[in-house]
Amino acid sequence: MTQAVKHLEEYDTQTRYQATVVSSERISSEASSDEIRELVLEVDDPGTTFELLQSVGVLAPGSPEFGNEHHFRLYSVAGLPEPEKSGRPRIEIAVKRMTYIDPYSGEEYKGIASNYLCDLKAGDTVTMTGPYGIVFELPEERDANLIMIGSGTGIAPFRAFVKHIYRDVKDWEGKIWLFYGAKSGLEMFYMNEKRDDFAQYYDEETFQAFKALSPRPNWADPIAWDRAIAERGEELWNMLGDPKTYVYVAGMEKMRDELDGVFAVLAGSKEKWLRRKAELMAGGRWVELLY
């Protein structure tokens, strides 16, 4: 496993292909202000192969007048539906419709790639690149403990990861802990009243899922990682000291500082936590996919 940080401009986007939208389904609650969609895409090139947890690039139309012919963004391969008779591969990606507020003018701007993808309909085509390497690799030890911490669309790769383990790895013995953070239950997807893709694993002895919610979502309070993690603090800290424990983090970049603060309390000091985290990272046992 590697921990190298790679920036978008470093990805090779020269090899491109077309994909057709098979379906676009809203998977966030209708009552939620967040719109998150699951897109099934059929790739026109039968020779292109994909694996779960790889990333694919999407080239949304840019602004040529500003020198940006395309707007490039990465999305995790969240699922691999069975191909139809054509033999063309199909992939699933999860997309959250994003908006941004300019801190100076207060003006709202739409995320280019996310709004482009969320507006696509069945039959539309999209230009893609990749696939790119797997960020979260499964350890060779079947008794390894896996701690997955995700927020927002960061849950998508973990859905694929957990599915792969319980479908394809029959002798998994280690603990699998999933921490899912959101402002409220309405903002959770793949784990809400409309659709809970993790429900099939709740009876597995090795699997546990924990929700970390904001105490006051309407007041923009941050996700309460401290509550969800502190409730299992002693056992979690002991797991982090086990050389067979691997931690995977996916979501918004601000999670890094939020989690560092929580784990510093768990460790007893910021310095002690940063030493432990450095050890985990050096051993490839702390891996982040942040955007």
Describe the function of each predicted region:
Residues 138, 158-160, 258-261:
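Short glycine-/acidic-enriched loop or helix-start segments at secondary-structure transitions
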Residues 145-166, 183, 255:
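Active-site beta-strand/loop microenvironment that shapes enzyme catalytic pockets
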Residues 6-17, 32, 169-291:
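Reductase modules of NAD(P)H-dependent flavoproteins
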Residues 42-147, 164, 289-291:
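FAD-binding FR-type
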